[in-house]
Amino acid sequence: MRNAKIVCTLGPASDDAETIRSLADAGMSVARLNASHGSTDHRRTVIDRVRDVDDELTEPLAVMVHLKGPEVRTAEIDEPVMLETGSEVVFAKGDTSTPEFVGLTVSITECEPGDTILLDDGRIEAHVRRVDGEEVVAEIISGGKLQSRKGVNIPGVDLDIELITEGDERELELAADKQADFVAASFVRDGEDVYKIIDKLEEFGDADIPVIAKIERAGAVENLDSIISAADGVMVARGDLGVECPLEDVPVVQKRIIKKCVDAGVPVITATEMLDSMIHSRRPTRAEASDVANAVLDGTDAVMLSGETAIGDHPVRVVETMADIVNGVEETDEYAESVEQRVPSAKDQSRTEALARSARYLARDIGASAVVAASESGYTARKTAKFRPQVPIVATTPNERVRRQLGLVWGVIPRSLEYQESVEHILEGSVQAALDANAAESGDTVVAISGLVSNIDQAQTTNMLKVHVAAEQIASGKQIVGGRVAGPLVRLTDGDLSDVPEGAILSLSTAFDGEFTGDIEKIGGIVDAREGMTGYPAVIARELGIPMLSGAIVPDRIAEGQTLSIDAERGVVFEGNVLRTPRR
């Protein structure tokens, strides 16, 4: 069970149904669709494929539509163009490029003499000499071959470009129509840009899609607090940051962004060239493995693969490798120590955060196996994850979209659960989900936390924190004698107690109509299939003061000798010993 999740970019190498399923089996939690490539109609088809795969899985598989944004690229050309070092080149809006003229998708006349123009992730560098009307004249400082449609960065220059392009509007309409789980916004400058995306989604009828803000400009780093406050998540685009900012600053900026996001309880994705060599190689470099490991140690919610899975030679192997690296790091003492030392504070006057933080330390102090969160909207689960408990967070929700969205959140195992009857029933179902997910074993202690639940009669229980024993309920009945006891099951047919072990739980069928012979002191508890409070077994139970239920049938699948627990006050029988000391 990994804490850090994996986001995979789908492309020509991976967007068929079979490969999507294989990627999910290998560890993909979120499928990213990059609108910078391909068509909107094709993305519509791929979303349907992802949904079909999600329907087949226990673990959630979410869809992220990543907007192209107001990017600046060079013109589309058939053959590379050589830009010679020392030559003078004109940059202007246009659809062609030559050694003397570089066509761009937008005008960059906001430049001033002395500004730097970087092409193709900084591989080609030019310095602006002058601006003549709509043309920017620059000297090539570091030349090279310019390929088709390469990115253009101008550090420190705020170009007058609309945040949401016509193409972005089509993608946002698609996201709303197909109920995408996330929208990632490129070139976000501040919190206001995030709100513009949300407003546009609302126009298209779905303002509930979480917006992930991609941090890729120096200005965005300066406005990080407002972006984190406005966004539902953050993506650290190290590649673009490495062009916009001094290269030596990027590792520290990455750590700063991750820490701020964790402190705010906002999911953060670490992206760009994490296993880039595996686009063609079957093994990553040692530096790449260290890069992934350090992001995990920093506390990132997710690590992202781009070209490695979109156009790589073996996308599934890349995901398997990423999962192996993450798992390896998370199993170390260094990782556990790092998590323990970085627990953020709860916000002032936030009841949910105070309870979530308490759940984290309560789970640690009592040796709980999991934190179980009943989280209809996902809010309580996300807040619980903020405090990074050292055990899995099993979050249940009746909302399938929320289930998929929680697949991006650190340490959360999301499960579907229909909410009905009462908060207590919801918690019981959530604990059972933890058992089914192998996050806890029968008899383990778990910490249960619940947020406000709508459409429930007892919804006044807005936030609740309790210690709970995780066990599979196998029978229920009416209390005859109270108490709690655990012992080996004995199915008694004739009343003979001579071979009954000490502390046995007697299961009596509806056909039992005799009396006990032998040492009745050996009986630990009684589960009687017959209704009634005055029969012979009830008399014995009262005489001995041992727990007893009536009208409770132990299923045939439970073998003799297997340990059962009776909780007579609650009227239930559990499989296993729920009274034992919790494991640590």
Describe the function of each predicted region:
Residues 2-15, 68-70, 76, 92, ...:
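Active-site mouth loops of central-metabolism enzymes
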